[in-house]
């Protein structure tokens, strides 16, 4: 029943028909309104009132929800963050001037991955749109499944960053998920062929919002040509993706999706960078979580993360760049050392570092300022922020050109110097834009006086109209000689000159009659008419002219977007180098050595995060690993003693070294690591029905299938989620597998409570035992946090329970049970009379199952350290061939006393 709808409602339904899977924000005067099902959704999600207006197509009352237009920045992010797409349908003309219904149209579609408003994301993170193109290959992978070939691209339209890569080997799926974890896109688009792959979409949805996009975009042979047209190049070879079919498909899909949603040319997206996974250390989602690289495990915030600990950056660009570096440590010593050189110079030259960081404090988010300028969403305040940021560049440039000794800092200085024209842009903004302009660009008050003579005149007319009228009246009295002449105004006739009939003979010839009154005539002159138009419209024209001037300035800035973005990138890099130098000085870090061999040698290593949070000082520890004698470190010791911290700090020091950062140690040499694997902690995956043990085994399988001789593996308490026999068997098999993998095995740190594993040091030549030193003082237990060679024979479980605050009655009962189990172990063991061999009863087997460590009292003898009870130890010392009958009887009484 469209005939009962208003013209505005027809416009709404036309927009909804064009964007059926999108919520519509429909501009109606001072509000954005939504109707029907959209209104119900918006009211629910935004917790606003749902009302009704008019009638829908069926004649029923139409549900309505609306928000004030000026509050869109508050409400829109809430919908986007929940995964909705929102189409903004604006009024395309001034309602006051509209003839009939106001023209309206969708001006942009906001999605999680194409948001440009700063209120929708953090300055510290990129807001990536991810596009995946690919197909199922003909070959089978390791486990018999079909291999997949993938090209993936990441586009941040708020900064202009555009990246692409392609996977062509058998680990495509795992690498795709690793990239997903590292890049953390806000949205991912897939062609129907991949969208229908439930395994792929399921994994993607664990990390991001997944959308299906037009199939023809992902597979078109014209993708390469369209990319070349966009970038204005003749070939994609310079971007490195000319021969990467799926990388090109995914890149064009991402760009086309962004253009479709933004409905404009994305001129600030002016380059595409192709990267390879062989350039960076792989850190999968499990490792990122376990090592807390950028987020902590507790609440997924950045507090107590490595990123937060090292972050002394002063700019948003530096903030984001630091996070990228931490997520992608380098594999090339030649690329790492220039970073270390620059950090060393800035750490040593405290005055230069102080000046740089002081200047950087005035730099705003140039990348996103440029994005808003190009999109036409910038405010005058954004231009002032850009001006202040560009104003810092000469100081940074000149200081570095004068003092920089190492190549990386010199390159930054030369890059900043190559865009000296940017100073002209800052000067243009300084001359044109008020220092403290209003928020809106549509209400005037942002252009300085003196910039535009026309604008100055309009402002003068608007603010001085009364003075001008008075002066005009006096001038006309003198010219005509009519002393009673006056200038008046009414809404019907506008401004007029009024002359009484008595003085009509003195009216000048250029006066034009406008109205005859009973006692007077009203006239106007061309000058008065012109001024009338100016006076009546001066303010309106002034506001319009201001916006026109502002738009012209932004067009000039947009034309220099590439130079501005490259400047922002250099500033971000400099900020990170200065930040890491500051962290070095604040935390007493040292420069690591990077090598191509498999050695890891750390002296006095410290956990960078833990040492910044603990009081009383952090106990440093050494780590020595190589491919000859120390490839596999088996670490034993009680809970809470610091095994996990020690393993994590070793990995974090290696990661920091390959990032190009100084490290918390007195000395560190790291052989390049291609991937860090971790199996630490217990996490149930209840959503998919996986127990702690199942999760552990899945993660372990990933490690064993993918670790290489250049990897570093951290394993903590493997096998604890099942029976002790099963767990021990799995743990031992894992040690043997990693030790024997390839010619030199895989570097690994393995923390365990299975004491029997320490015997592997005698059987496997590259396994070395270490343990955490503990000091006992009566019932007190002191963790010394020091890693020392050799195995421990104690678990101290009951001691740890006491430290944790377990009630003393429970502690006492636990000790009683422990003693009973020890006695049971002796009493249940008997001789097999037929073959003379010992056999264990079921009770003894149960006891052994529970006590792979010997957790007895602190006064055990050296014999007990070998796994013997007091009775067994005493018996071991007895030589029956040398005893008399009476001595044997006395010894039997002694043994009985030992049994209590």
UniProtKB/Swiss-Prot annotation:
DNA-binding found in the keyword field: yes
Gene3D superfamilies listed in its UniProt record: 1.10.1420.10, 6.10.140.430, DNA repair protein MutS, domain I (3.40.1170.10), MutS, connector domain (3.30.420.110), P-loop containing nucleotide triphosphate hydrolases (3.40.50.300)
InterPro entries named among the record's database cross-references: DNA_mismatch_repair_MutS, DNA_mismatch_repair_MutS-lik_N, DNA_mismatch_repair_MutS/MSH, DNA_mismatch_repair_MutS_C, DNA_mismatch_repair_MutS_clamp, DNA_mismatch_repair_MutS_core, DNA_mismatch_repair_MutS_N, DNA_mismatch_repair_MutS_sf
One GO biological process term: mismatch repair
Name of the gene encoding the protein in the UniProt record: mutS
Name this polypeptide is given: DNA mismatch repair protein MutS
SMART domains: MUTSac, MUTSd
Species this chain originates from: Methanosarcina acetivorans (strain ATCC 35395 / DSM 2834 / JCM 12185 / C2A)
Cross-referenced PANTHER family: DNA MISMATCH REPAIR PROTEIN MSH1, MITOCHONDRIAL (PTHR11361:SF34), DNA MISMATCH REPAIR PROTEIN MUTS FAMILY MEMBER (PTHR11361)
Entry's family note: Belongs to the DNA mismatch repair MutS family.
GO molecular function: ATP binding; ATP-dependent DNA damage sensor activity; damaged DNA binding; double-stranded DNA binding; mismatched DNA binding
SUPFAM superfamilies: DNA repair protein MutS, domain I (SSF55271), DNA repair protein MutS, domain II (SSF53150), DNA repair protein MutS, domain III (SSF48334), P-loop containing nucleoside triphosphate hydrolases (SSF52540)
